A protein has these predicted regions:
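Catalytic phosphate/metal-binding cores of nucleic-acid and nucleotide-processing enzymes, i.e., regions
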Residues: 1-189
């Protein structure tokens, strides 16, 4: 148990360092067994974001998102995750991706998204991002990200997938995530 706890702390420090490398002040959260006031990593520049950090070889992404949502206390839930020898990935609810696209979630666009609410539909309207959709099989997120990277060419890429309850999730590299945060990717059409 001590080894896995130390691995968790190390992962939290690494994710904190990712924030710092991208110009955000961040620190490890106060750990109180997953209470809403204790995200794994706190970024004062993003007070409405809750980050659950995982460093495991075989992550149950659905369970991690359930935990992140539960612990988020009304904030936007994200799972920052990686496995050995892979870069950091960030997974979020699809609606959060639309907000990162700086889309107005009202009006005609929201009505169309509510009908399908799939990342492919949103990404289909944005020519500078490739959205790889994975359905109908057990998800290996790292294989899906590698495939999306190959197919995207020079475009940004995300992987859309559904959790065990059918909710759409989106996973992207931390590099893409931080570019979205800084607004460095082209705006939506």
């Amino acid at each position: 148990m001590k080894i896995s706890r130390e691995k968790g702390k190390r992962a939290e420090r690494q994710w904190r360092d990712e924030f710092r490398a991208h110009g955000y002040a961040a620190r490890r959260g106060q750990q109180f067994s997953g209470s809403p006031g204790s995200p794994d990593v706190v970024c004062d520049d993003l007070p409405m974001y809750h980050f659950e950090v995982k460093h495991v070889e075989h992550l149950n992404l659905s369970a991690a998102m359930v935990q992140a949502r539960r612990d988020a206390g009304g904030k936007a839930a994200f799972v920052a995750h990686r496995k050995n020898y892979w870069p950091w990935l960030v997974t979020m609810d699809a609606e959060r991706l639309y907000r990162l696209f700086q889309r107005d979630l009202t009006g005609e666009w929201a009505t169309r998204m509510a009908a399908e609410f799939s990342p492919a539909q949103a990404c289909g309207e944005v020519d500078w991002v490739h959205c790889q959709i994975i359905t109908g099989r057990r998800l290996n997120i790292h294989e899906a990200v590698a495939q999306a990277r190959r197919e995207a060419g020079r475009r940004a890429f995300v992987v859309g997938h559904q959790d065990r309850d059918g909710r759409w999730l989106v996973t992207m590299t931390s590099e893409t995530f931080f570019k979205f945060l800084r607004g460095e990717l082209p705006p939506a059409n």
